[in-house]
Design a protein with these regions (language model features):
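N-terminal Rossmann-like NAD(P) cofactor-binding subdomain of oxidoreductases
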Residues: 2-207, 212-214, 302-305, 349-350
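Short glycine-rich or small-residue beta-strand-to-loop segments that form or flank ligand, phosphate
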Residues: 9-12, 156, 249-251, 312-315
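Conserved active-site and cofactor/substrate-binding residues in soluble primary-metabolism enzymes
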Residues: 18, 136, 160-167, 216-224, ...
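Alpha-helical scaffold segments in soluble metabolic enzymes
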Residues: 22, 26, 167, 171, ...
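Short amphipathic alpha-helical segments
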Residues: 151, 246-248, 308-310
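Contiguous C-terminal substrate-recognition/catalytic subdomains in enzyme active sites
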Residues: 202-294
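C-terminal active-site/capping subdomain that shapes the small-molecule cofactor and substrate pocket
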Residues: 251-350
Length: 350
């Protein structure tokens, strides 16, 4: 990993999982960032190119380090941005030791996403012992929080499902076009959303030729969606047999007395997201494959006169815009770099 003067120095702590390796891929193409450290405790001592051959051309000699306190202190010395690809409770504990020592901490876990520490025992099963730092964390969705992100020291990257649902629904709630209760979000995700570690419910013979709903009534992304959309909703996620992608189909009622058509909904979304580099408002139904490998989210909307429902559909790559790409986009804003650096809105096809 060669370093260039004036480039931002990057560390990824917890780099051996899918979000970590996606970050490494994106940073390899970033014109103003250099990766100087990548830890992965379960893979410490393993060559990155051995575990992920797709990165061999850019990181031929890089080896995953470990994150014990002494070693980590050396690895993050002088770092401009540290991405945390760790379990929620690990990020909860580590973030306070990094904030103020590195320019910006970007956490890809849920440890600092919710507004209230009191919500964590119910939705995540642990007590949040950093309520003051939680208040300082900035939610990492630039399309809705761009100004707050400028100069942020701690960024909480949104959940993948949350990004898909929020970008579909938040504009219509904010514009007063749909009711802020009774919303339904049905979303389907590829298997990479479950992470790299093999489990019974994500091995090939389990997911192949299958589709199932999970997290019924209590998926942990629910409160995050409600906070960011500003509405009460029912969320049901589904696992589908593809590697990457999320398709969210959302249903809502129009505000009483409003005059809504399909075209007025699409026009409202286009106006809300005007000049957003990664938002594509389409007349056609979005597809996950069109977003593969990109930081784009594709959105469309319909009004059904027969039932009186508004339907909004969004598609994105769960590992890119839904995780690592969104994290890099937020980091760019926080560090004062061009927001699109290292990212593309063009998917890989076919």
């Amino acid at each position: 990993m060669s370093q260039t003067t004036n480039h931002k120095k990057v560390a990824i702590i917890g780099a051996s999982g899918y979000t970590g390796v996606e970050l490494m891929r994106l940073i390899a193409g970033h014109p103003e960032m250099d990766l100087v450290a990548a830890t992965g405790d379960s893979q410490a001592g393993t060559a990155v190119a051995s575990l992920y051959p797709n990165l061999a051309a850019h990181y031929p000699d890089l080896v995953f380090g470990d994150s014990n306190p002494d070693t980590l202190a050396q690895q993050i010395d002088g770092v401009d941005v540290a991405f945390l690809g760790l379990p929620h409770e690990a990020s909860l504990s580590l973030a306070p030791t990094l904030v103020g020592k590195v320019g910006c901490v970007v956490d890809l876990s849920a440890a600092y996403r919710l507004k209230e520490a009191s919500a964590y025992p119910q939705w995540y099963g642990f007590t949040h012992d950093q309520p003051e730092l939680l208040k300082k964390a900035v939610y990492g969705l630039p399309e809705l929080h761009r100004q707050e992100l400028v100069g942020a020291q701690l960024v909480a990257t949104p959940g993948c499902y949350v990004t898909a649902a929020t970008m579909a629904l938040a504009p219509l709630v904010r514009l007063g076009l749909i009711q802020n209760s009774g919303i339904i979000v049905d979303a389907a995700s590829g298997v990479s959303g479950a992470g790299r570690v093999p489990k019974q419910n994500n091995n090939f013979t389990t997911v192949n030729e299958d589709m199932n709903a999970y997290g019924l009534l209590d998926h942990r992304h629910t409160p995050e969606m409600q906070e960011q959309i500003g509405a009460e909703l029912l969320f049901t996620p589904h696992l589908v047999p593809m590697n990457r992608g999320i398709l969210a189909t959302c249903y809502a009622r129009p505000v009483n007395g409003s005059s809504i058509t399909t075209q007025s909904l699409i026009d409202a979304l286009k106006s809300f997201y005007a000049n957003e580099p990664f938002v594509v408002i389409r007349s056609e139904s979005p597809s996950t494959k069109a977003t593969l490998g990109s930081n784009a989210v594709h959105i469309t909307a319909r009004y059904d006169e027969r039932t009186g429902y508004v339907m909004v559909i969004s598609a994105l790559d769960n590992l890119c815009k839904g995780a690592s790409g969104g994290a890099l986009q937020a980091a760019n804003v926080a560090l004062g770099l061009p927001e699109t650096s290292g990212l593309t809105s063009i998917g890989v096809y076919p």
